[in-house]
């Protein structure tokens, strides 16, 4: 049985010139700014433009970009190895989706369709549930799956344990 594990994270700009587009994606999310698109889009542009200079300074201190994709790839590799070594009946493959930067759900859904799994396991890497993080990521994923007529048994691992 083939199982696809979809790891969700926020994402982050990979280089300084991508800080403003990343911020725009963040603030253009209806779960962040709950406004009609005609208002949300220009407001997201304005906020991203105003916050970009300060955010660029912070990302510059981090080496010029966010480490989140690299770290999430390391987590995905370790999880895939562990799952495949513990379960001889299933073949697991981990995929990464970033909500506000690359790789985006739109592209990853196509990769998952090509993998042709029997089951999907959605696993947000946010430490707790929030409509603006886990909720938004899962909604975007489900919307894109519907758009691509991709239907497969799906389960969701929501949040980290509290104890």
Task: Label every model-predicted segment.
Residues 1-163:
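Active-site-proximal alpha-helix that buttresses catalytic centers in soluble enzyme cores
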């Amino acid at each position: 049985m083939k199982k696809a594990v979809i790891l969700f994270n926020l994402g982050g700009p990979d280089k300084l010139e991508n800080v403003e587009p990343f911020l725009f994606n963040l603030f253009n999310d209806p779960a962040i700014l709950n406004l009609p698109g005609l208002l949300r889009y220009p407001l997201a542009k304005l906020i991203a433009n105003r916050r970009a200079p300060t955010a660029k300074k912070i990302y510059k201190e981090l080496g010029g970009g966010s480490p989140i994709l690299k770290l999430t790839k390391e987590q995905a590799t370790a999880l895939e190895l562990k799952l495949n070594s513990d379960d001889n009946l299933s073949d697991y493959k981990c995929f990464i989706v970033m909500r506000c930067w690359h790789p985006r759900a739109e592209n990853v859904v196509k990769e998952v369709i090509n993998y042709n799994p029997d089951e999907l396991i959605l696993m947000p890497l946010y430490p707790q549930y929030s409509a603006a993080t886990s909720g938004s990521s899962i909604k975007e994923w489900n919307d894109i799956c519907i758009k691509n007529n991709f239907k497969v048994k799906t389960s969701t691992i929501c949040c980290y344990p509290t104890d």
